[in-house]
Amino acid sequence: MVLFLGTVRSTPRMTLLAPISRRSAPATSIMRLGFPASSPRRPVLRASLSSGSVTGDDASRGTSQNEQSEIIFMGTGTSEGIPRVSCLTNPLKKCPVCFKAVEPGSKNRRLNTGILIRYTGLNGKSNILIDAGKFFYHSALRWFPAYGIRTIDAVIITHSHADAIGGLDDLRDWTNNVQPSIPIYVAERDFEVMKKTHYYIVDTSVITPGAAVSDLQFNIIEEKPFVVHDMTFTPLPVWHGRSYRSLGFRFGNVCYISDVSEIPDETYPLLEDCDILIMDALRPDRSSSTHFGLPRALDEVRKIRPKRTLFTGYDAFDGSRHRKRRS
């Protein structure tokens, strides 16, 4: 069930892994869901949101036009992002990853986690964003023009930390210049936070008339399946630190969990028969109080048994070095 709130306005506008194959999501990449690549070539995966079948990486093998959908990784990094200013200005130069990240085209450059789902449904293609963090605008500057993306048809929020909602203000570029408004789907607890952090967007009656702020339509979601532009999303409740609830989402046979330190028992049944699992893995050696590290993430993969897994939310992890070891 989704409860539409709108906004308060002064004027009426409204992988079974055995052996385990560790794959990390590219710093920013595209995952194809059922059709050949027409955009600039990136690492790709294939799956059907309806049938759940997974194929290989060969971009020459496609499916029918009515199944054309894709996922674009807007960011795969931490809240601070990579590179960090503190590393680049450290005279001891202890972090080679951050120095590599400033090189043109470096895959070690990572912004806040988030994905864009380009879904072709009965009513055409929709662009559905999961999270708009504080680096969202930088991601959009790079990837929206590259893939010919102009509109944002909906934003679904996983939790109310800055790396998930810090870019809501930047949506004004779309609502002022591209489209009248953008629907936001958010849990009530996170909406209550937004009333404080983004009070002028939630209640536009407090702003100066004519001020250019994001025109957002807030929809409260429960921990039950809901539909956005013909696509069903099933919330995947997880813990993101002690007593802090975050949501992953299942759409088709793709399960996306970007911020997690513990998966409750009641969530595991929602992950059954998952084709592609995209999951949080902050560090290669250990977990933190709020995020899985790679060892714990691999344990969860063995338990969930998806057909394929990608890890996201990496900290200062040298992806190029890892790829060389695997080659």
Residue ranges, per PLM feature:
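Short aromatic-enriched loop/helix-cap "lid" or pocket-rim segments at secondary-structure transitions
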Residues: 82-87, 196-198, 323-324
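Residues in the short beta-alpha loop(s) of Rossmann-like NAD(P)-binding domains
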Residues: 77, 133, 188-190, 314-317
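Active-site neighborhood of divalent metal-dependent phosphoester bond hydrolases
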Residues: 178-182, 188-218
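Core dinuclear metal-dependent hydrolase active-site scaffold
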Residues: 30, 34, 43-147, 210-269
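Residue-level signal for inorganic ion chemistry
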Residues: 71, 194, 309
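Active-site metal-binding motif and surrounding structural segment of the metallo-beta-lactamase
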Residues: 120-186, 274-276
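Active-site flanking residues adjacent to catalytic metal/cofactor-binding acidic residues
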Residues: 130, 158, 258, 279, ...
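Binuclear metal-ion centers of metallo-dependent hydrolases, dominated by the metallo-beta-lactamase
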Residues: 3-13, 19-22, 26-37, 41, ...
